[in-house]
Every structure is written in structure tokens, then in C-alpha cells.
From Swiss-Prot:
It comes from Citrobacter koseri (strain ATCC BAA-895 / CDC 4225-83 / SGSC4696). One of its GO terms (biological process) is ubiquinone biosynthetic process. It comes from the Bacteria. Is probably a protein kinase regulator of UbiI activity which is involved in aerobic coenzyme Q (ubiquinone) biosynthesis. This is Probable protein kinase UbiB. Its EC number is 2.7.-.-. It is a multi-pass membrane protein.
Amino acid sequence: MTPGEVRRLYFIIRTFLSYGLDELIPKMRITLPLRLWRYSLFWMPNRHKDKPLGERLRLALQELGPVWIKFGQMLSTRRDLFPPQIADQLALLQDKVAPFDGALAKAQIEEAMGGLPVEEWFDDFDIQPLASASIAQVHTARLKSNGKEVVIKVIRPDILPVIKADLKLIYRLARWVPRLLPDGRRLRPTEVVREYEKTLIDELNLLRESANAIQLRRNFENSPMLYVPEVYSDYCSQDMMVMERIYGIPVSDVATLEKNGTNMKLLAERGVQVFFTQVFRDSFFHADMHPGNIFVSYEHPENPKYIGIDCGIVGSLNKEDKRYLAENFIAFFNRDYRKVAELHVDSGWVPPDTNVEEFEFAIRTVCEPIFEKPLAEISFGHVLLNLFNTARRFNMEVQPQLVLLQKTLLYVEGVGRQLYPQLDLWKTAKPFLESWIKDQVGIPALTRALKEKAPFWVEKMPEIPELVYDSLRQGKYLQHSVDKIARELQENHVRQGQSRYLLGIGATLLLSGTFLLVSRPEWGLMPCWLMAGGLVAWLIGWRKTR
């Protein structure tokens, strides 16, 4: 490790211990070496004993910086992993991150706009940030060109070196995991960190986020379910993004939603519909749908509409992944575990030599207890989590797009059941999945595929005769080459047979001549002739092997 990495590691350990986060480790897992190591750091006591554990965890992650804050944001929706008091504190990381100086933000905006003063492009620029996140900060203004209210998102200054330094350290730690944990190699920690790095680096490029938001807005144009604010791409750069300012109720503010008369059941169901529409219709889904990025319009509470922001992380599935995923869900809820196992093999998610019977039994063992709950209480996200964890025991490769999907599905479920605890995800999603699968087979699907491919075939039609001629010529040449190789192999086989025969004869004559020369000297030159013949036969046989 470099001196800088050692200092950073020391800071991380000191931060964790000063907030007493060693309490998160179960006592049964604290081995003697760990206990001795903790005693050796006696000068790092818990300095926040008066605070609850959840608050201490939040403050520690906040102190460690953006890499750890994003990690905490991801964990905030995993209420199956933490008690409510910890999950509630982690959720605060989404909205309450200390802002950086507004003057620095203004300077960055001016640099992005070619060095011109902010007043040349915007009116009513507010130096006080509207919101502050782990990666970026948002300020409000009005466009000078048309007077529309906008928000300006700017990346935190000098954030990239900090992220890279932390990620480099995490990579080093990840390489130790297989040595420290018996199951560490199968977890592929380095690949997990690599995917996490890609996600973080992508979030630092606001041009990418702008393009994502424009695409998502186009996909849901005039939709009654989701509104995506307009992006003013002429003002956007890698470090700055300008988009329409929206007014809505945070989706986590259930009390205000109810006070506004929102149809909570319809709102929860529309969240599920929006997610499955993005995944299966558009193959392009918002993959960071935590409560801080979702609002609900004040207008028409009886027919509520979501407002989505922060499109820095998106995911996509190819056609085959979508089909296998939809069929997996339906097979699972029909308790057809054999079908689930076969789908994993057919899709290539697990190796083709996987024992399907063993895989089916493993899935049944893990998933059957889920059905002890009423169907309405079964979590899609946990279904995927259980399936993927089981499949990883059978050497399932890490599928980044499926990891993003599973994480997003947990977000959607968490929000939906917070809005309407009786939400039946399966009842809401099943018609959509069955309709989508039905749409992928039969005459309509064939007609659609022909329409999609028609321009390609029209373009390639003039080339077909030449391609056919080239193919026939190559086939003829290939056949000639195959025949030539076959003849050479046959000739080589014959030569090898002759060589072995002559070598055997030569060895026999040499041995016989030597024996007679020693035991029957009265035979005169006969043994010498035998030895000479054997040597000639052996030399001829040896040459045939060349």
C-alpha cells in the first residue's frame, strides 16, 4: 500500500471505531485475533455512546465521503437486512448531506459556460443550494432566454480523486476476501467492486445523465403514470446539467400525500406498472429509484402521477434476458421449479453442464418456504434475491443488469408497500407479464419481426447473388482443402504403419545377429549379414517417420 492508502485505511478504521460500529459484528463472529486487534486499538474508543447505533452508522458513512454515502443509500431500502431504526437513519443519507460552498458551485457553472458570469445565462440564481447529494449539488434559477424555472446540478469539486482513492483501497480489500472467507471466491468481490466503480464513474458524467433523462422522458411522453422533467441540453456539460424545476410531494411523505387526497392504492400499483413498463416495453429502466428521487404531482390526486428525477443510473435488458426473466417469475409463482432451473440453464446464466435435478432441488428447498406467506405478502425482490443466491452456488456468473434490476425492484416494492401496505405485487404484475410473453410469440410477433427486419433485407437483397456465389466458391474450396487434408492424413497413416513394421523387423534382425555372433561364432559372416540387414531396415523405417 502507498502511504496515502495507509492513511486512508487508518481513517476508515478510526471512523468506524470512534462511532462504535464494531458492535455490528455478531459476537459469535469475533475471533480471538479480532478481539486482540480491537484491544490493541484502545486509543480509539467509541466517542458517541450517547447516540443510537443507526445514527452512528449514518454519521460514520457521511464522514467517510461519497463512496460510502452511495453504499448507505443502496442499503437504506434493504429493510430485510436491518432493523427499522437503522434503515430509517440510512434513509436520511438520501436528502441530508452537508452542502459545499455555493460560491464554488457558481464558479463551476461559470467555467462550464465558457467563463461568462452566471447572470449572462440565468436570472434569480440562488447561491444557497436547494438540495445536496453525495455526488452533486442543486441550485435554482430562471433561464434568461424564456424565464422558465430550472434547477442546475453541479458535480462536487475535486470529487473524482477522492472516489478513485477509495475505490483503489476497496479493490485491495476485495482481493483479500477470498483469503479470509471460505466462500469468498464464489462471491467474486473484485467483479462486484468493478461494477460499483462503473456505476459511480457514470454518475460523475452529467452528459450521460442528461441523455438518460431525455430518453426516459421520451418513453413516457403523455403518460398518465410518470412525468420526467425537461432537460435543457444546450446548457449541459460533463460537470453541469440544467433541467426543468418541478414541484411535487416526496413519495416518502405519506402524511402529506394522504392529506392531499391521493389515491394511495392506485399510486402504489402505478409504481409497479411503471417499473415493468420500463423493463419489458422499453428495455430501459431507472435504476436509482430510491425515495429521494421520486415525487408525486400535486395535481389530480385521484389520478396520481409520479415525477422521476436523477437518471444517473439506468439499466437495460436484452430481449432474451427479458423473456427468461418473465418466464422465471411466472414459473416461480406457479411453483414449477423444474422450469425455473431449465430457464437458468437455457439462458446461459448458469453453466450448460449444471445438473438440472440438483439445481431444481436447491431452488425448491430455498423458495418453497416463501409460499407459507399469503401471495400478496411475497416480495418479488426477495424472490429474485433467493434465486440468484441459489444460482451462484451453481457457478452463476455475475449479471450486472440483473443485479441492477433486483436492486430497483426492491426499491419499487419498498415504496409501494410504504404507500399501500396491502399492495399485491403479483396481482398487479402477472397480467402485464403474461400479456408481454403472449406478445412475443405467434403471428403478431412474427409479423412484427418481419417488419423490423424488412429494411435490412431490402438493403441486402442486391448483394445476395454475390454472397451466394462467394459462399459456393468458398464451400468448393473448403471441400477441396478437406479432401487434400484427408489424403495427406491417409498417406501419413500408411507411412506410419510401414515405419513401425520396418523398425520392428530391423530391431529383430539386429538382436538376432548380435545373439548369433556371440553364441555361434562358427556361423561365420551370417550374424553380420543379419545385423547389416537389420540396420538397413531400421534406417529405412526411421526415414519414413521424418
